[in-house]
A protein has these predicted regions:
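Terminal, charged accessory segments of proteins
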Residues: 1-182
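Generic alpha-helical propensity signal that fires on short helical segments
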Residues: 59, 63, 129, 184, ...
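Short amphipathic alpha-helical segments at helix-loop
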Residues: 147, 185-186, 264
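A short, highly charged nucleic-acid-interacting micro-segment common to nuclease
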Residues: 152-156, 182-201
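Catalytic core segments in nucleotide and nucleic-acid processing enzymes
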Residues: 190-346
Length: 346
């Protein structure tokens, strides 16, 4: 399958992670063709900012310092003396200004400037440049030191998706120094794809199988004595059918290699097996439900890929792959088959 299909599927995965992408304002993106993931993200952020401009750019109070002939706000005495502004019959004052030069708008502008250095189409770059006009009074921000712990309220909640996409873009395109030259990193590395893959599978099951109450549930240890130093156990996806008293724990994995080699012998990643086994056995001890587990790897190009059913210590386990490089309808069928095999046909 072509790289174009994988890029398109990444967009669909994002549409589950960011539900706003399913709104009409973004529908035309689905029909576009992209050269790479950077081009796709540029299209999303362009459309997102265009939609935001139809409302308004977020404003907030920022502190401005200026030399003024009339008093405003707080007088900066030391600065006024140092600059001898009184000789010009002026004072250095600091005051609050309701401005579009907000922290989030700085992130948006810096993201646009970063994308202009990326490998995206000329028409896309022209579209991004046209948006910069609206940010002429907005300062840039150091993209290496952004505080992503942003606060949202009724006035800026439409920025939540924009900031999420900006974070993916900036972390994917951060410039690194190598021999004095700046270069762009791979846009979506293994770590970022791992988080997107996990979020996609969880949100897919939340949307299409609400009766299974999909969530990233915590698992308590079946232990006696002091347990405060035991690591927490949080599943990627837990599905629960209360009527059938069945629980399925899914641990998603996105690796460049879904198998490990030990002494020239291929095997499943031992840490992953221990992890899913621990989740299932500890969960089973705290419930009357039948508990099963799946290690769900994103499919790679390896000769040997996981695809096996196992019974371990009386519990059913699967180690299987999800092929992301197929038409999205086929991708959905793979996810639906997991539900069918574990809750419907079982």
């Amino acid at each position: 399958m072509s790289n174009e299909i994988l890029i398109k599927n990444i967009y669909y995965m994002l549409s589950y992670a960011f539900q706003v992408l399913n709104q009409n304002g973004y529908k035309n993106i689905e029909t576009e063709r992209f050269n790479n993931t950077a081009d796709m993200f540029a299209a999303i952020i362009q459309k997102g900012i265009e939609n935001q401009l139809k409302r308004y750019l977020n404003r907030e109070y920022v502190i401005e310092t200026d030399s003024l002939s009339t008093l405003r706000g707080k007088i900066e005495i030391n600065e006024s003396i140092n600059q001898m502004s009184f000789l010009k019959k002026k004072l250095i004052c600091s005051y609050d200004e309701f401005s579009i030069d907000s922290y989030m708008n700085r992130i948006l502008k810096s993201t646009l400037l970063l994308l202009l250095k990326a490998d995206i189409s000329k028409s896309r770059k022209q579209g991004l440049k046209s948006l910069l006009v609206y940010f002429s009074s907005v300062h840039e921000i150091d993209v290496h030191h952004i505080n992503w712990k942003l606060q949202y309220n009724q006035n800026n909640q439409t920025y939540q998706m924009l900031m999420g996409i900006c974070k993916l873009i900036i972390q994917g395109l951060l410039q690194t120094q190598s021999n004095g030259k700046s270069k762009l990193m791979d846009f979506l590395d293994e770590q970022r794809m791992c988080r997107l893959y996990e979020k996609f599978v969880l949100e897919y099951y939340k949307k299409h199988y609400p009766e299974l109450h999909a969530n990233a549930a915590m698992v308590d240890w079946d232990a006696e004595g002091e347990t405060q130093y035991l690591p927490s156990m949080q599943t990627d996806i837990t599905l629960c059918d209360e009527k059938q008293k069945k629980i399925l724990i899914i641990d998603t994995k996105y690796y460049n290699s879904s198998m490990q080699l030990q002494f020239e012998r291929a095997s499943y990643h031992s840490g992953n097996m221990y992890q899913i086994l621990s989740y299932v056995k500890n969960k089973e001890s705290k419930t009357k439900c039948k508990v099963s587990g799946i290690l769900l790897y994103a499919k790679t190009n390896e000769d040997i890929t996981p695809n096996q059913h196992l019974s371990i210590l009386g519990n059913h386990f699967e180690v299987r792959t999800l092929d992301l490089n197929v038409d999205f309808s086929t991708l959905k069928s793979q996810l639906d088959l997991i539900i069918h095999n574990n809750f419907i046909a079982a």
